[in-house]
């Protein structure tokens, strides 16, 4: 039953994407007074806001042996759903690192979907409640429409190792 609900949720989410007004919508964060992104976002949108993306992306060096092993599993994770907050320090750190891993895997960008939340864990025009998001960033890995694992907030080991463990079926339960 859980798998059916997840599949329906992803289908609904995909349907909403088709009719979404705009990616990379900006609002002012009430706490910091800075601009943040909300709703569906793209990598380009993340790269434009705040300057943190490029710095973390350039500094991160994924483990090459884990990257080599991940290349064997690429067909096993056809869809990656990332829920983040552009106001969140963990998102500033982990999301660029995740993209560095995906780039080294030459992973197609159309297989990655991102939603940015505000501090109340809400996204404009999207019901995020179906995904049980408590912390950001949350990386949801799916296989054939079913969730196979999550990396929540920060990895247990490294992003690439946690992703590898999810694909091997040996990942620890999410926190």
Task: List the predicted regions and their residue ranges.
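Structural alpha/beta surface segment adjacent to cysteine/selenocysteine redox centers
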Residues: 124-135
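Thiol-based oxidoreductase modules, predominantly thioredoxin-like and allied folds used
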Residues: 82-86, 109-123
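N-terminal leader/targeting and pre-domain segments
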Residues: 22-75
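Non-catalytic, surface beta->alpha helical segment in thiol-disulfide oxidoreductase systems
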Residues: 135, 141-175
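Bacterial Sec-dependent N-terminal signal peptides
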Residues: 1-23
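Conserved redox-active cysteine motifs that mediate thiol-disulfide chemistry
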Residues: 86-94
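Conserved helix-turn-beta segment immediately C-terminal to the redox Cys motif
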Residues: 71-79, 97-115
């Amino acid at each position: 039953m859980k798998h059916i609900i997840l599949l329906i949720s992803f289908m609904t989410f995909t349907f909403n994407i088709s009719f979404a007004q705009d990616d990379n919508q900006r609002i002012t964060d009430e706490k910091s007074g800075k601009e943040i992104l909300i709703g569906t976002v793209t990598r380009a949108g993340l790269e434009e806001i705040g300057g943190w993306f490029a710095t973390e992306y350039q500094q991160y060096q994924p483990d090459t042996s884990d990257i080599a092993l991940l290349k064997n599993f690429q067909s096993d994770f056809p869809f990656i759903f990332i829920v983040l907050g552009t106001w969140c320090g963990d998102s500033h750190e982990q999301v660029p690192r995740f993209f560095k891993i995906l780039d080294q895997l030459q992973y197609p960008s159309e297989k990655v979907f991102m939603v940015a939340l505000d501090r109340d864990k809400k996204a404009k025009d999207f019901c995020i409640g179906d995904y049980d998001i408590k912390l950001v960033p949350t990386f949801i890995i799916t296989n054939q429409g079913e969730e196979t694992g999550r990396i929540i907030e920060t990895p247990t080991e490294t992003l690439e190792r946690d992703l590898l463990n999810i694909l091997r079926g040996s990942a620890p339960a999410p926190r």
